[in-house]
Amino acid sequence: MWSTPSGPVFRRFVGAVATGVSLAATSGCTVPADAVAGISKTADGRLLGVMMVCGHQIDGATLSVASDDVDKQVTVGSWTADRPLTPGLATWTLDSPAAGWTATRSLAPLTAKTTYALYGWTKDNSWSANSISFTLADRDRLTPGKVRYDSISDNGGESAITVSIAEFKAKACQNM
C-alpha cells in the first residue's frame, strides 16, 4: 500500500533536493593554485612574464583578454616551458622566444583600454597560478626589477601591487 507524503514534508524534501542540485550546478570545479603569476619589464622595455612556483609545478602560461565570461576570453599569447617549472622563480619575455620556453601562440599586439590576464597552468590541470590582470597603462608604469602581481591578504582579499623582484620571491607564496 502506498502512502502519500504530507505536504510540508514533501515540500521540504523537494526543497532540499533542489538546493543540492543548485549547489552542484553552480559550484564549478577549479584547479588549485600553487603558483603566482606576475609581469615585469626588461631594461629595454620588453614585457616579461614572471612566475613564482610555490610547491608543485607549472607547465606553461597563457595571456588572454580578461573576461568573466569564459566564452569571451580570447588568448593573445601562450607559452610552454621546455621543462616543468619547479618551486622558485621563472621569467621569460612575452614578445619573442625565450630560452627554455616555446611560444605555442605568439604574442598578438596588445591594445589600449583592454584588460589582460596572465595565468599559469599544468598540462593535466592539476595545478594553476593565481593570475595577474593588467592594462597597457599598468605595464607602462612598471620599471625593470619590479613585479606587478595580485597579493592575497591574510583574510583572502586580493589586490594588485608592484614590488621588487626580491620582495616578490619572498612574499608571493604567502597565504597560498
Q: Residue spans of the language-model regions?
A:
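Bacterial lipoprotein signal-peptidase II cleavage site
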Residues: 30-36
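C-terminal motif of bacterial Sec signal peptides marking the signal peptidase cleavage site
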Residues: 24-28
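Short, surface-exposed binding/anchoring microloops in extracellular/periplasmic proteins
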Residues: 36-84, 172-175
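Extended, polar beta-sheet/loop recognition surfaces of beta-rich domains
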Residues: 48, 123-176
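Extended, well-structured beta-strand/loop surface patches
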Residues: 22, 62-111, 123-145
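A short tyrosine-centered beta-strand micro-motif
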Residues: 112-119
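Bacterial N-terminal signal peptides that target proteins for export
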Residues: 2-17
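A mature extracytoplasmic/lumenal domain signature
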Residues: 53, 120-122
